């Protein structure tokens, strides 16, 4: 069977890793890891593989950072603007993190080449970053190191948030819900983080987004000084100036994001509601379905698959952890109906209650979620024309004996929905 992935000009050396990937050129390296492009032997797909020296991570105390990165990416891997994690493998001396290959490289490189971006291009990247971070925050994850060097581009030029090594997961918060670890890159770091007091990770990320948008439009960071103490003073005093070419709406957003007081600082969700942000917005209404599904499933069927330090750091033999990402069985179908979107949502909720599911409705986006045990169903409705709607139905079961359960729940849904369905598709 011919591979669905087109042949790439990437040079692959022929070195085979654990019988699964052919290694190619080195993309980058650090003190304890190096990254190579590689090709999957089974599919032909290009991926990036981060090869981590286990002993060096132990010696430098970096293993918690690796665990955070893997666990955050695992939880967020369905958002189109978060770099996807495919699998984790390990040997006695190495950890192999296999992720999506971002052929466009770092956004930082593009900024160096062009100096600054026009407002339309800057807005597109900012929209994608805000969408990804909003998704992270709804799952209780703060990135804490947002900067162009950690934002990659795929071959279509879409932004991919990467490097979750400094991220904070929900379980890292103290009893008052705040974070206390000072981290990040100084020029992008919020003043409350610098002050080393408890802080809200989402608000700290919002500050970094303000710096990011300024950098895209101006071509330089708003707070810059060779003396780090002087730079921190500027950050606390909001001491910066806008170049003349930045528009008033963009200035307003940046100013509100760069509010030294986190209590009054604009949130990322508030930014997403502004006219400036929504101009030329390319995100499809259908895109949210996968995000809603995974968030709903995470709440309904808490998985015990969290990757532990023992799993990765203390391994004494080869191990393929790809199963962590293959435990869910999905089935989906689309139908049209000559009723209102509200009627479809109402009907789906009634079906859920009848079949013994817990029902959650997200009215503003016409999404209804049904949960029972380790099964989640999501129905998302979009009005296609007056009196005609299109609905996506997804059933997911997480666990070992999932095939029969998926078919069982699927059959029940089909029968109950027939009353309103005009026609089924795919």
Swiss-Prot record:
E.C. number: 2.7.11.1
Gene Ontology molecular function, alphabetical: ATP binding; protein serine kinase activity; protein serine/threonine kinase activity
Modified residues (Phosphoserine): 167
Residue positions, PTM Phosphothreonine: 181
One BP term from GO: signal transduction
Keyword entries, A-Z: ATP-binding, Kinase, Manganese, Nucleotide-binding, Phosphoprotein, Serine/threonine-protein kinase, Transferase
Protein name in UniProt: CBL-interacting serine/threonine-protein kinase 4
Species annotation: Arabidopsis thaliana (Mouse-ear cress)
